[in-house]
């Protein structure tokens, strides 16, 4: 596989990631910060099912720090998703490099405390977490598996933007 074909495969993977992230953000994640009357009962039921099935304490009773991440997702990330999807599906859009690096760094930074909390928080003693909680290490790993793609794909994006020769190349503008 040539360099162009490999680059296009990664761009398509990234495009799919950003397209898939739009409904997840709108219909699941933002229920924690937007008024409940904005959502049909089916979406509320879906969130309730997910929270109980996976014992996700962050989505059952979101702590304030987690809500701040979701607010950033609403204000900064959600508007970026269709722009990034367009750029990666179209391909060869060097202008996406800096915004993609900013997005990736921001997302990776937010996922670190989320994953750390899911792995190491003593939910039995934590006042902020009510409802069902992961009780076994296996349940914690299952939850980490749900959140991990949102760390791994931005990490791939970051490395792709920093290391791919096509995106590293800076076009010199002609002087008039």
Swiss-Prot record:
UniProt KW keywords: Endoplasmic reticulum, Membrane, Nucleus, Transmembrane, Transmembrane helix
Motif (ER retention motif): 172-176
Location(s) in or outside the cell: Rough endoplasmic reticulum membrane; Nucleus membrane
Pfam families, alphabetized: EBP
Domain EXPERA: 10-158
Family per similarity comment: Belongs to the TMEM97/sigma-2 receptor family.
Subunit text: Homodimer. Interacts with NPC1; the interaction impairs NPC1-mediated cholesterol transport. Interacts with PGRMC1 and LDLR; the interaction increases LDL internalization. Interacts with histatin 1/HTN1; the interaction induces HTN1-stimulating wound healing. Interacts with TSPO.
Name of the protein in question: Sigma intracellular receptor 2
